[in-house]
Amino acid sequence: MSRTPLSALIAATLLCATAQASAQQAQPDFPDGPGKQTFVNLCGGCHDINRVRLGYTPEGWRTVMRMMLNFGVPVPQGEIEPLTQYLIANFPERPRPAAVIIAGPVEAAIKLWQVPTPGSRPHDPLATRDGAIWYTGQLSGKLGRLDPKSGVIKEYPLKTPQTGPHGIVEDKDGNIWFTGNHMSLVGKLDPKTGDVTEYKMPDPKAKDPHTIAIDGNGMVWFTAQNANMVGRIDPKSGEVKLVTSPTANSRPYGLVINSKGIPVFVEFGVNKIATIDPNTLAIKEYALPNPASRPRRLALTPDDAVWYADFSRGYLGRLDLASGEHKEWPSPSGPQSQPYGIVFTKGALWYNESGAKPNTIVRFDPKTEKFQSWAIPGGGDIVRNMSVTRDGNPVTANSLVNQLGLVEVK
């Protein structure tokens, strides 16, 4: 089943408590049974039957409930379990494509850690220079730091409640920067003191800072997906500049910085990849050949070629920005495999298939053009971004199962 509506599901719950009039009208659309009235009163005015019918596993629905509670949805204590059981009974997970596991020459093992706050929804991971693994707890309103050697996780509360931390990056001084996806801000955490500095968006339309990266000059870049913007922060002056994408509803998403210091980003709402000039802030767009392409994340190889995970079509792709040359390969688990997070390390592209069951980690060797893949233990669900440790191992955050992962390449 597709996981793409989950963000909308969570965001809409903020309105559910005030939607009872609409919910009463929607009541006939939902199956009868214990828990129905709670669902109708709190959620039915915001979520139509088709969205909810996308379904989850029993544990998935329990996780969604914890996420909603973390985010302040006013479910009475005595109604939490009946509502959960109602969702489990009536909206099971829809069939998903079976993962295709391909053997190959590389040995790798996947290690997992459970994050301490239930329903945290760890969104983006970050491997830092000191060997730690950080993550954004999007629905706990916290950042977390894992020591992979000891397994100890420390959580850092943020200044603004329900910030919705999303993207995460480390600066040269060891500060941890993050995007406040729900509160129109970018933040900086000092891990030594726990102090948080916030940079508020100067335009109220820039409500959802998304992915974040830092260039070689220390400038902080970020996308704002639904605002259709790209932003830049000068940490020295605190100035925030915003630029609107030239294509309406293009939804700037994944973001990386190439070797020339140029930010490269995906436009998830259309079939485009774009760059932004760090001096003039002019945006240049590159259309992908297939109009149905919708990459979410991208990675760069040492030659600055752009590799992307085409979520909508189940492909891995390569785009040379200089020549315009383009090539694609179908992902092992097929057109509904939903490739998502992607990194380049140890001479290969590593990405995950978020639509396959179980979720997979896929390795692609650009020299031989051969794939190799591994099932994520426990099923995964769902890796939205990846990072790379100082010794070159891929790192994941598995949001729906509340886990962090490390792919130890032998």
Regions found by a protein language model. Give the residues of each.
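Beta-strand-rich domains and repeat architectures in extracellular enzymes and scaffolds
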Residues: 111-142
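Beta-rich, blade/repeat-based domains predominating
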Residues: 118-130, 161-173, 204-217, 247-263, ...
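Blade-level signature of beta-propeller repeat domains, shared across WD40, Kelch, NHL, RCC1
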Residues: 380-410
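Conserved beta-strand positions in repeat-built beta-propeller and related beta-rich domains
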Residues: 133-139, 176-182, 220-226, 263-269, ...
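Electrostatic cytochrome c docking/interface patches
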Residues: 21-38, 70-73
